[in-house]
């Protein structure tokens, strides 16, 4: 049993992947809350309730924006570590999501500092549905990756 750089990468990736799973679960909960608030017909005509709703939507979008860059950076760190450790299969599995993250980041709206989640555009049912599907797909990817990293870590520790 030998401790190699690849084993260290898998250990660190396990911990960071758990944090990414929590990030994505938070995204799913936030999108569900936005969808529920969007469909709630109670107090539609009350202006005070409308202002409160808008503040709640802006608060949720602000929190969502704060998680985007750390998620992308952590996933980029995964790819960089696996590139340095010459773990080509693992890098190949992570590369499509990294490219999607880069595409999504560089194609974000450039009309200010709103970032990916704008309080006005997120309430469009199509955009909200897309974001929710994206979060569920990321959750599936990160969960499968977590168990793959666990298996690879054990295999790397035992095989050398």
From Swiss-Prot:
- Residues on the Lumenal side? 32-72, 160
The keyword Hydrolase is assigned to this record? no
Any one Pfam family match given in the protein's UniProt record, by short name: Cornichon
**Segments passing through the bilayer:** 11-31, 73-93, 139-159
Q: Which residues form the signal peptide?
A: none
Q: Which InterPro entries match?
A: Cornichon, Cornichon_conserved
Expression sites by tissue: Expressed in the odd-numbered neuromeres (r3 and r5) of the developing hindbrain.
Where is the protein localized? Membrane
Q: Which GO terms describe its biological process?
A: cranial nerve development; synaptic transmission, glutamatergic; vesicle-mediated transport
Q: In this UniProt entry, which cysteines form S-S bonds?
A: none
UniProtKB keywords:
Membrane, Transmembrane, Transmembrane helix
Top-level taxon of origin: Eukaryota
On whether Membrane is a keyword of this UniProt record, the answer is: yes
Q: How does it sit in the membrane?
A: Multi-pass membrane protein
User: Which SMART domains does the protein's record reference?
Assistant: Cornichon
GO-annotated cellular components:
dendrite; membrane; synapse
Molecular-function annotations in GO: signaling receptor binding
Q: Which residues lie on this side of the membrane: Cytoplasmic?
A: 1-10, 94-138
Q: What does this protein do?
A: Regulates the trafficking and gating properties of AMPA-selective glutamate receptors (AMPARs). Plays an important role in the proper development of cranial nerves by facilitating the secretion of HBEGF.
Spell out the subunit comment. Interacts with HBEGF.
Concerning its family, UniProt says:
Belongs to the cornichon family.
Protein name from the UniProt record: Protein cornichon homolog 2
State the taxonomy lineage.
Answer: Eukaryota, Metazoa, Chordata, Craniata, Vertebrata
């Amino acid at each position: 049993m030998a401790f190699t750089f690849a084993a260290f990468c898998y250990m660190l990736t396990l911990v960071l992947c758990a944090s990414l799973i929590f990030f994505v679960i938070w995204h799913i909960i936030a999108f569900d809350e936005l969808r529920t608030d969007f469909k709630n017909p109670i107090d539609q005509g009350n202006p005070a309730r409308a202002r409160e709703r808008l503040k709640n939507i802006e608060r949720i979008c602000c929190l969502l924006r704060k998680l985007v860059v750390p998620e992308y950076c952590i996933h980029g760190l995964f790819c960089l570590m696996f590139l340095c450790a010459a773990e080509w299969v693992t890098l190949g599995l992570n590369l499509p999501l990294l490219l999607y993250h880069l595409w999504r980041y560089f194609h974000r709206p450039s009309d200010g500092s709103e970032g990916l989640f704008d309080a006005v555009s997120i309430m469009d049912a199509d955009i909200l549905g897309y974001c929710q599907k994206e979060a569920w797909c990321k959750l599936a990817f990160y969960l499968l990756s977590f168990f793959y990293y666990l298996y690879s870590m054990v295999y790397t520790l035992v095989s050398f």
